[in-house]
Amino acid sequence: MNNSKDNPFCGAIARKARIYLREGLDCVYFLNKAGQAESCPACTSLVFQGKTCEEHKYNNNLLSWQAVRQLERQMPQLQSSN
């Protein structure tokens, strides 16, 4: 599953993801096409090998831990307004 040849940013994405995991995230998150945070347990285990899963191989929209925390804070507000 070494996809660094396909996406030149894959190694950089994996390095950033490792930093975010060390800063407190429990999982790697990407922004999906609908603009929502999407966790990826497969990427979470692969980033320590410098890789991402096949599904996220071309998704450079890695979410930082700050962005994930901000989205988590907004979720109860969005759910209570429905």
Swiss-Prot record:
Keyword terms: Eukaryotic host gene expression shutoff by virus, Host gene expression shutoff by virus, Host-virus interaction, Inhibition of host innate immune response by virus, Interferon antiviral system evasion, Viral immunoevasion
InterPro entries referenced in this protein's UniProt entry, alphabetically: Acc_prot_5b_avian_CoV
GO biological process: symbiont-mediated suppression of host gene expression; symbiont-mediated suppression of host innate immune response
Keyword set includes Ribonucleoprotein: no
Function: Involved in host translation shutoff without degradating host RNA. By suppressing host gene expression, facilitates the evasion from host type I interferon immune response.
Name of the protein: Host translation inhibitor 5b
Organism whose genome encodes this protein: Avian infectious bronchitis virus (strain M41) (IBV)
